[in-house]
Amino acid sequence: MADEAAVEASFAETLDVFGRVDSCFANAGVARSGRFDETTTKEWRAVLDVNLDGLFYTLRAAAGHMRARAEAGDAGGRLIGTASLGALMGMARVEAYGASKGAVISMMQALAVEYARFGVTANSVLPGHIETAMTADNYANEKFANAVLPRIPIRRWGDRSDFEAIAVYLMSDASSYHTGDSLLIDGGFFIN
């Protein structure tokens, strides 16, 4: 997602194959853990390049297509961006990640306001402790699991199906009046 030309080419190919895009879920993320005062600009940018710039490239292409469609009389669409529980909580040693995901929330709220007149909704999804390739090492770590799992009222790690179900809802007509929101999927971790 960090390669602007590749994102634009991929979007053009999608339009060639399907003729239109009704929903776009920009779902990508990378993290780098380390002391903030030892983080290099290159390391900082590497996280923002994917988490924020890649989201911008992807959603810009989709929003432009949806606006043009609406101006031609075919309004509607769904824009979704993946933020993170880390956008709401101070998480030491992953400041670039938290900052980038906080920016996703702000971007999605701004898009919700700007594109509503075109029948487009925009929301962010904030996964908490969801098992993915990026998080697998954390959940396998007994010390981490013993510290975090008891704070999740549902008492389990989230899995992809938890995340996917929210995405399906946000892309459906059932969410046509749901915009500018940040949906936290964390099993109750944040409120506990």
Model-flagged regions — what are they?
Residues 59, 100, 108:
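Active-site helix of classical SDR
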Residues 36-37, 89-95, 117-118, 155, ...:
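Active-site loop immediately N-terminal to the catalytic Tyr-X3-Lys motif
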Residues 156-185, 190:
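C-terminal substrate-recognition "lid" of short-chain dehydrogenase/reductases
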Residues 35-36, 43-48, 148:
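Substrate-binding pocket helix/loop in short-chain dehydrogenase/reductase
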Residues 25, 116-121, 178-180:
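Short, small/polar-rich loop/turn modules that mediate ligand/substrate recognition or access, typified
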Residues 64, 113-114, 176:
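Alpha-helical segment proximal to the catalytic Tyr-Lys
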Residues 84:
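Residue(s) in the substrate-gating loop at a strand-loop-helix junction
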